[in-house]
């Protein structure tokens, strides 16, 4: 079976892990690299590439529907909420660390960085969250693979860089930094999770289904439902995070929408029952809208369309 993937270091690491897991199940695979629009246009923010929605996903869907690949591996947070019915998410792998990490040259934490320090990030959400806590900090766009980002930090182009901790883990790199609690920096929906998709009704679907991790599937679905009605995807400062409690009776859910400048935030932080959690998450999503979440998201989209913060989007 042929697995399609982006060609970045991180995407290849994720795909090689899936190939290894399938081999353990007796399934032989080969890997085919697909160049996506998100990879081709690294000189511009993601929201300027195909509208920012599915910039790393759409081309893989196309080659799968054309029968050129059997399986595709994605960072789940890159995947649009609305997906082709013919390409189901067959497996959600066990989640890696879902939180953000700040790397600075000398290990200085966010609250001790000097005024006017420059932090590189590719995420509107992280930018808004930084501004909420440290409005004196300057945020600048930072795209490229993880090696490139670390090199720019070492060269002094930034005083710090913020990215997903999971990316470092998947590369096998142990780098010390400040890891942020979801109570402080609510992560992007599905951050730290890898999804595996196939065409419906194929041998690949049956094989990949053996890799599905039930708990990770539950919480990632909850996270998507919480923010589904807000719209905007990676082009709005939105976070959501769900985790099953140790007693396995409830799910702790957090979701927030921020203004681009971080001065306004609407947040939900509640426990919902594990059984029936999907419906309860929908109710909380409606409440987030009623509290003004959609208004904030729409205002952010309008500002972006006018050029405000055009340097930032999502990504790792």
UniProtKB/Swiss-Prot annotation:
One of its GO terms (biological process) is protoporphyrinogen IX biosynthetic process. Pfam families: Porphobil_deam, Porphobil_deamC. SUPFAM superfamilies: Periplasmic binding protein-like II, Porphobilinogen deaminase (hydroxymethylbilane synthase), C-terminal domain. Binds 1 dipyrromethane group covalently. Keywords: Porphyrin biosynthesis, Transferase. It comes from the Archaea. Its cofactor is dipyrromethane. GO terms for cellular component: cytoplasm. It catalyses: 4 porphobilinogen + H2O = hydroxymethylbilane + 4 NH4(+). InterPro entries: HemC, Porphobilin_deaminase_cofac_BS, Porphobilin_deaminase_N, Porphobilinogen_deaminase_C, Porphobilinogen_deaminase_C_sf. Its EC number is 2.5.1.61. It is an enzyme of class 2 (transferase). The modification S-(dipyrrolylmethanemethyl)cysteine is found at residue 234. Tetrapolymerization of the monopyrrole PBG into the hydroxymethylbilane pre-uroporphyrinogen in several discrete steps. PANTHER family: PORPHOBILINOGEN DEAMINASE. Belongs to the HMBS family. HAMAP family: Porphobil_deam. The porphobilinogen subunits are added to the dipyrromethane group. This is Probable porphobilinogen deaminase.
């Amino acid at each position: 079976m042929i697995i399609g993937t982006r060609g970045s270091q991180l995407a290849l690491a994720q795909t090689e892990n899936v190939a290894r897991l399938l081999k353990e199940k007796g399934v032989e695979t080969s890997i085919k690299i697909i160049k996506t629009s998100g990879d081709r246009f690294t000189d511009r923010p993601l929201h300027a590439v195909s509208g920012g929605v599915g910039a790393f996903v759409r081309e893989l869907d196309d080659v799968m529907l054309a029968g050129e690949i059997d399986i595709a591996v994605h960072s789940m947070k890159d995947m649009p909420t609305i997906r082709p019915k013919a390409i189901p998410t067959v497996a959600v792998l066990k989640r890696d660390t879902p939180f953000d990490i700040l790397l600075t040259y000398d290990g200085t934490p966010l609250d001790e960085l000097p005024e006017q320090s420059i932090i590189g990030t590719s995420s509107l959400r992280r930018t808004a969250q930084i501004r909420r806590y440290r409005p004196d900090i300057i945020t600048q766009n930072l795209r490229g693979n993880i090696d490139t980002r670390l090199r720019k930090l070492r060269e002094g182009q930034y005083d710090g860089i913020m990215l997903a901790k999971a990316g470092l883990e998947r590369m096998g790199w142990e780098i010390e930094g400040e890891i942020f609690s979801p109570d402080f920096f609510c992560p992007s929906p599905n951050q730290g999770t890898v999804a595996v998709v196939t065409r419906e009704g194929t041998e690949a679907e049956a094989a990949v289904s053996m890799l599905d991790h039930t708990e990770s599937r539950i919480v990632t679905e909850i996270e998507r439902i919480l923010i589904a009605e807000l719209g905007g995807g990676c082009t709005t400062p939105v976070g959501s995070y769900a985790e099953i409690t140790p007693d396995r009776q409830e799910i702790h859910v957090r979701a927030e929408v921020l203004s681009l400048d971080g001065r306004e935030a609407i947040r939900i932080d509640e426990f919902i029952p594990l059984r029936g959690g999907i419906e309860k998450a929908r109710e909380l999503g409606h409440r987030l809208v009623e509290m003004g979440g959609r208004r904030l998201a729409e205002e952010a989209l309008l500002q972006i369309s006018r050029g405000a913060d055009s340097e930032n989007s999502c990504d790792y």
